[in-house]
């Protein structure tokens, strides 16, 4: 595993006398996204936060450390990591009326093993110049032969695409989803590669007309001097607005099985699912809050309202192994 960057956050100088309380966090989410929230949490509660940040390897670390792990809480950047932690039995039940009231049932585990903190949409980006807006587009349309040679995407095995394929299985079954995957593969402009931003760049450069990507990357690219031109070259489309709604992925949190400070971890989750932190957390990363009624960032709000797929995430998660199997069977990435 690569060297882990450790970030220790706390307000020891200004915190109240009970600041000896602590919560230890392993985070897949970048420091700039969580630091303002954790600082405010410490200010409000006196509970210090110690953070270990890494882009990869944290789940393996929690598993390897076992009972000796210092992690009380894991913050994930995608839904797949939440499911991995649960499947490996590295979590404990989140019991909180506050969390249950703040987070709709579709965005928390039915057994209380994880909870979502922010939402993002699996959008289809389209070239403004060559395609225009596609308000009636569906994920199913991506397999239509009329789009042959026009689609770009990252690996089908990436958690973002794996979740989408799992949702297709949940809605359409194995056989129809395999046929759909074969159709999408036939329409690819190039082999799956790169990240979501690379797909938008490819649209800008004329390599493809459509690209799969998470909603928040558009906001991130518009803030980046080098990438702003890529983002300005595409429209953001919310698929399946005429039927079930667009597929949603999430970031989230779990309390670890061997947490030494589970009460403080729960307090942090309760704080992060309440209105103030929801607004901060979602706005910093151009995402959508999981709590209803929380104001969106002005940029995200400018994309307009849309219908979400209401299928619970823990239902979709049941089909992740089969989704991976189908992606391999159709040789999607080859």
Predicted features by range, described:
Residues 20-84:
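Early extracytoplasmic/lumenal segment of secretory-pathway proteins
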Residues 26-29, 91-100, 110-111, 114-115, 126-128, 134, 140, 227-247, ...:
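Short beta-strand->loop
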Residues 69-74, 92-124, 140, 151-152:
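A structural signal for short loop-to-beta-strand junctions that line the ligand-binding cleft
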Residues 79-90, 109-137, 165-166, 248-254:
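Periplasmic solute-binding protein
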Residues 167, 172-239:
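Ligand-binding pocket segment of bilobal, Venus flytrap-like solute-binding proteins
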Residues 251-310:
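Mature extracytoplasmic/periplasmic domains
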Residues 298-334:
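Extracellular/periplasmic bilobal clamshell ligand-binding domains
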């Amino acid at each position: 595993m690569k060297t882990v960057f450790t970030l220790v956050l706390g307000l020891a100088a200004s915190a109240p006398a009970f600041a000896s309380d602590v919560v230890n966090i392993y985070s897949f989410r970048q420091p700039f996204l969580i630091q303002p929230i954790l600082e405010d949490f410490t200010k409000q509660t006196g509970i210090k936060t110690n953070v270990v940040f890494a882009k990869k390897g944290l789940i393996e670390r929690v598993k390897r450390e076992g009972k000796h792990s210092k992690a009380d809480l894991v913050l994930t950047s995608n839904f797949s990591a939440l499911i991995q932690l649960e499947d490996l039995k590295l979590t404990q039940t989140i019991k909180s009326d506050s969390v249950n009231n703040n987070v709709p049932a579709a965005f928390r585990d039915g057994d209380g093993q994880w909870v979502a903190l922010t939402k993002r949409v699996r959008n289809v980006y389209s070239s403004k110049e060559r395609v225009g807006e596609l308000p009636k587009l569906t994920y199913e349309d991506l397999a239509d032969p009329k789009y042959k040679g026009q689609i770009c995407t990252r690996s089908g095995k990436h958690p973002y695409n794996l979740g989408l394929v799992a949702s297709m299985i949940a809605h359409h079954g194995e056989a129809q989803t395999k046929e759909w995957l074969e159709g999408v593969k036939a329409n690819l402009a190039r082999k799956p590669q790169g990240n979501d931003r690379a797909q938008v760049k490819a649209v800008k450069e004329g390599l493809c007309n459509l690209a799969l990507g998470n909603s928040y990357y558009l906001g991130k690219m518009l803030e980046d001097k080098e990438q702003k031109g890529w983002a300005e070259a595409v429209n953001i489309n919310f698929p399946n607005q005429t039927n079930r709604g667009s597929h949603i992925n999430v970031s989230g949190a779990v309390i670890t099985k061997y947490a030494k400070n589970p009460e403080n971890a729960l307090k942090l989750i309760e704080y992060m699912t309440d209105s103030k932190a929801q607004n901060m957390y979602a706005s910093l990363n151009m995402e959508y809050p999981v709590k209803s009624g929380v104001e969106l960032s002005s940029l995200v709000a400018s994309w307009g309202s849309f219908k979400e797929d209401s299928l619970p995430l823990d239902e979709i998660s049941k089909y992740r192994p089969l989704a991976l199997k189908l992606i391999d069977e159709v040789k999607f990435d080859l």
